[in-house]
């Protein structure tokens, strides 16, 4: 696979961000997850670029983008996305966000509305990942919370400590199916480690303490929600997202199909087919 061409731009607060751009046609922007990178979409960029103008962004302090100790919050990442669309003068854009990338899309919609957008694709992200001990079982299921507040604090502290890489490996190893090869597992870890561990901890804290349940029912764009049956992000919470967005589509990858958090890496053939069928 040939290396995709890269571009760069400077955000409104002076940070240089790198992106991959390939193809022509209607634009689709791919937004990676927490502490990941644009290169993880390598199995999507080439096939999609046969039909679309594909842009895969390395968010601030991720991948090949500038590493800075500020702006490590979802609201700033969504403004970075806004800056990217303005810089490239993109309109009628489809946004695809994996994991935290979905939160960036939700925050964009909350702050800027559907400006410049045509469709969204939300891939494997719960509405609120930190549990409230006062929730009912139904609220817990709908939110898709997978961590307690103490677990968030402990993980953030670990990412700032001497065992940061070990903790990273443990977290990432729990996000692929048993069929995933050691090469795939290591590649995901290496993408993750491109972000300085203390920065990753700061961003994780913000990610885990932001609740999108009030934003989701107000979405009035066409939406595709993709989940994994065996994912660390509970699929039922994403079914809840589907029910809240009128006219949305919902697809679940079963475990033998690579139905964990990184299904777009484990089963790119099915993933790409679903995306292209949805985009048209």
Task: Please annotate each region the language model reported.
Residues 75-93:
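Conserved acidic catalytic loop of the alpha/beta-hydrolase fold
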Residues 106-111, 116-160:
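Flexible "cap/lid" loop of the alpha/beta hydrolase fold
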Residues 131-137, 154-217:
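Conserved alpha/beta-hydrolase catalytic His-Asp/Glu region
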Residues 218-260:
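Conserved loop-alpha-helix segment in the C-terminal half of the alpha/beta-hydrolase fold
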Residues 256-268, 272:
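Catalytic histidine-centered segment of alpha/beta-hydrolase-like enzymes
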